[in-house]
Amino acid sequence: LAKNDGFGTIEKLSDDPLTVKYTIAEGVQWSDETPLDAADMLLQWAAESGVFNEGEVTYDEESGAIIPGADVYFDAAALGTGISNVTQVPEIGDDGRSVTFVYDSPYVDWELAFTSPYVPAHVVAMHALNIDDATEAKDAVLAAIQDGDTAALKPMADFWNSGFDYADLPDDPSLYLASGPYVISDLSSSEAYITLTANENYVGDLDPKVETITVRYNEDPLAQVQALQNGELDIINPQATADVITALEGVDGVTVATGVEGTYEHVDLVYNNGGPFDPATYGGDEDTARLVRQAFLLTIPRQEVIDKIIAPLNPDAEVRNSQTRVPGSPGYDDIVESNGSDFYAEVDIAKAQELLAEAGVETPVDVTMLYGKSNIRRASEYQLYAESASDAGFNLIDGGDDEWGSLLGSGTYDTSLFGWQSTGLGVSESAATFRSDGGNNLTGYANDEIDG
């Protein structure tokens, strides 16, 4: 864990109850020179803890964006993680630069539970409550949270959810403030790039070494190679395929670095969209839905994906049988022995057909798969999955979309194919994915035992 004391510090004050103090370093500010302080941290706690969330939340089926309701609801990805374990309003100290969390129960990842504020509290309140002065806006945030004023929290939550959702550089510079070494200076959805410029008002220890950085996005790795060859880019990080490696070998003056990383391809099934894996489709019959899910998993040709797509790049690659541990890491073998992954270890078309027959569903069963359409590897995987699924009685519908990321969790597909990165240091980082209230739970999976 690399600490950044130039931004702030974390101090554990007590084990029982677990009490942790988070302090912002003196002088740290947003790029508009407004101090970054307890108001920003308290707003982030309010959003990520879910303490003030009420009612049910609904999302737009096409965009996946949250639809504002009548109640307070912060749509934070961190819901269900460690901050949810802090239910009392944190105490402010150090002249407004610190907040102290008292956890309801012990939490092993307390050093990782709270990140630096990424949304300026004064901007949220200025827009949501029509306040012109930054200091007055911060005071309004503090008062609303400390008093539990839902009338003020409701518009702030709505703006927190959607006010910073843009694809091109906004006319209002308050919407792209930064507290780090760089600030956004240009953003284009049509040309798929973002430009970062050194933040002239940055206060901290991580002074920028390059004045301007432009990052371009392209789902097609071969197009990235072409842009590098044309001199349009200085560095690329394409998803590796045999074709990409071959293409890079033909580019003069380029250094190619390859290696193994913690990303793994995975297929998720959606439990709550009225589709083939949702019990609601069968009148609430969970057993039928489970049989259909099991049948589908038995068609996933994981080893064939390794052999045909991954092995040409990494002959030592192997299937991964745990969502929480990488092969070779401590505890991996023990987890695999008991997590049920042996059920779908091998493709078994005959067994899949038996399960569908037992479920009593009409075949072929339509299943829509979401993936990055221009991503060569994912498109190749989809073809392998579709061929195998059809043998068992599934019709795997091509739901490839280059905007796949924004569609995750929208319920507009039945299964998804993308990559997770195992880069976090947290012991409990999977909670956000597998708890029913987890902000990263994109499938609708719910299990009382997991929720605790």
Give residue ranges: language-model regions:
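Primarily extracytoplasmic ectodomains and periplasmic/lumenal surface modules that are beta-strand-rich
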Residues: 29-31, 106-110, 316
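Surface-exposed binding/hinge segments that line
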Residues: 21-23, 61-159
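Extracytoplasmic/periplasmic ligand-capture domains
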Residues: 16-56, 173-176, 180-309, 328-452
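N-terminal lobe/hinge region of extracytoplasmic solute-binding protein
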Residues: 1-15, 177
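Short, glycine/acidic-rich hinge or "gate" loops at secondary-structure transitions
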Residues: 58, 312-322
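Short, exposed beta-strand/loop patches in secreted or surface proteins that constitute
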Residues: 9-13, 89-92, 184-187
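A structural "hinge/loop" feature
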Residues: 1, 6, 110-122, 268, ...
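Gly/Pro-rich hinge or "lid" segments in bacterial periplasmic/extracellular proteins
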Residues: 119-205
